[in-house]
C-alpha cells in the first residue's frame, strides 16, 4: 500500500509539472507575439504619394528600407496644420529609423517615373493609409 501511494504521488507531480511547462510555453508565445513588429513590403507607384497614419492616435517608430534603385522623399507633417516637421530623402538601398508622434502623418513621396519599393517595419499597427497622385 505504501508503494502505491508513492507511485500515485509521482504521477500527480509529473502531470502538474507538464501543466506548468505548458503554461510557461503559452506565456512565452504571448510575449513573443506582443513584441512582434508589424512588417510589410510596400510598392509606391510612379508619381504617387503614400500617406500613413491619418487615423493613428499613438506614437510609433518606423524602420524603413528603400529596396529600389531610385530615391524616395519622406515627409512628416502635423495633422491639424499641415506644417512639415521632418523631411528626409532616402537614397536607393538606404535605411532609416523614424520616430513619429501621434499628431503626425508620414508622406512617402515618389516623384520618380518608376515605382519605388520599401520595406516598412512598425512598432504597432497604424490606422489610416492611402495613396494620392502627386
What positions do the PLM features span?
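Tight coil/turn sites that cap or link beta-strands
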Residues: 41-49, 53-55, 91-93, 103
Amino acid at each position: 500500500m505504501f508503494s502505491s501511494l508513492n507511485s500515485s504521488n509521482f504521477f500527480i507531480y509529473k502531470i502538474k509539472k507538464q501543466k506548468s511547462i505548458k503554461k510557461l510555453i503559452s506565456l512565452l508565445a504571448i510575449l513573443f507575439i506582443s513584441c512582434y513588429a508589424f512588417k510589410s513590403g510596400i510598392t509606391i507607384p510612379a508619381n504617387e504619394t503614400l500617406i500613413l497614419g491619418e487615423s493613428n492616435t499613438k506614437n510609433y517608430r518606423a524602420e524603413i528600407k528603400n529596396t529600389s534603385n531610385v530615391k524616395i522623399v519622406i515627409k512628416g507633417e502635423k495633422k491639424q496644420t499641415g506644417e512639415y516637421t521632418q523631411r528626409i530623402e532616402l537614397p536607393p538601398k538606404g535605411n532609416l529609423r523614424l520616430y513619429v508622434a501621434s499628431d503626425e502623418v508620414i508622406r512617402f513621396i515618389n516623384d520618380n517615373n518608376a515605382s519605388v519599393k520599401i520595406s516598412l517595419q512598425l512598432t504597432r499597427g497604424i490606422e489610416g493609409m492611402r495613396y494620392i497622385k502627386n
